[in-house]
Swiss-Prot record:
Gene Ontology terms describing biological process: proteolysis
Superkingdom as given in the UniProt entry: Bacteria
Name of protein: Staphylococcal superantigen-like 1
Pfam families per UniProt: SSL_OB, Stap_Strp_tox_C
Its EC number(s): 3.4.21.-
Span of the signal peptide: 1-30
Keyword Lyase: no
Top-rank EC class of the record's enzyme: hydrolase
Location in the cell: Secreted
Cellular component GO terms, alphabetical: extracellular region
GO function terms (MF aspect): peptidase activity
Family to which the UniProt record says this protein belongs: Belongs to the staphylococcal/streptococcal toxin family.
Length: 226
């Protein structure tokens, strides 16, 4: 229970330091707040630094009906909230051979990293190179479609990671969230024809941050901006 003790202590200190207690809000209210995010808010969120750890061990527990996974590497302690299918993907207690993709929620300077989802199983074998290179198409307004390869290095990859990396790239290389360029979507097409879509006008839904897909079976990725 060491991880849980650390988590509670960190959370208590954070509340004392900021004087803020975060309460639950209903999903309808949360979605409304997300949809109201401005270009600058989205640009800020998808430009935040990320913390990535591979082949680590985490501790999963439930506290007051909520599911968490704790990971400590060196002096970096992270508490990850599991809100979607990931809460059933990992067992209570110790989970080894996992990868975590951490993007801090909020802008506090607390020592603990508070993140949502982004936990996946580590690769079953070690790869020398990338495991998959699906076609990446970038479509911006009425401009010609740009095509490239997108390099996948994980067998099990979270929508959170794909969403972040694709938007970060679009921000830096194609002007997403600048000069009114906020609408559009990301479409990830699998080998069997099924698709996963992400709305660029809002942050990825919290419940989907824990979803993961088979990186070896991604056939094509389309990023449409307008």
């Amino acid at each position: 229970m060491k991880f849980k003790a650390i988590a509670k202590a960190s959370l208590a200190l954070g509340m004392l330091a900021t004087g803020v207690i975060t309460s639950n809000v209903q999903s309808v209210q949360a979605k409304a707040e997300v949809k109201q995010q401005s270009e600058s808010e989205l640009k800020h969120y998808y430009n935040k630094p990320i913390l990535e750890r591979k082949n680590v061990t985490g501790f999963k527990y439930t506290d007051e009906g909520k599911h968490y996974l704790e990971v400590t590497v060196g002096q970096q302690h992270s508490r990850i909230t599991l809100l979607g299918s990931d809460k059933d993907k990992f067992k209570d207690g110790e989970n080894s051979n996992i990868d975590v993709f951490i993007l801090r929620e909020g802008d506090s300077r607390q020592a603990t990293n508070y993140s949502i989802g982004g936990v996946t199983k580590s690769n079953s074998v070690q790869y020398i190179d990338y495991i998959n290179t699906p076609i990446l198409e970038i479509k911006k307004d009425n401009e010609d479609v740009l095509k490239d390869f997108y390099y996948i290095s994980k067998e099990d990859i979270s929508l959170k990671e794909l969403d972040y990396r694709l938007r970060e790239r679009a921000i830096k290389q194609h002007g997403l969230y600048s000069n009114g360029l906020k609408q559009g979507q990301i479409t990830i097409t699998m080998n069997d024809g099924t698709t996963h879509t992400i709305d660029l006008s809002q942050k990825l839904e919290k419940e989907r941050m824990g979803e993961s897909i088979d990186g070896t079976k991604i056939n094509k990725i389309l990023v449409e901006m307008k």
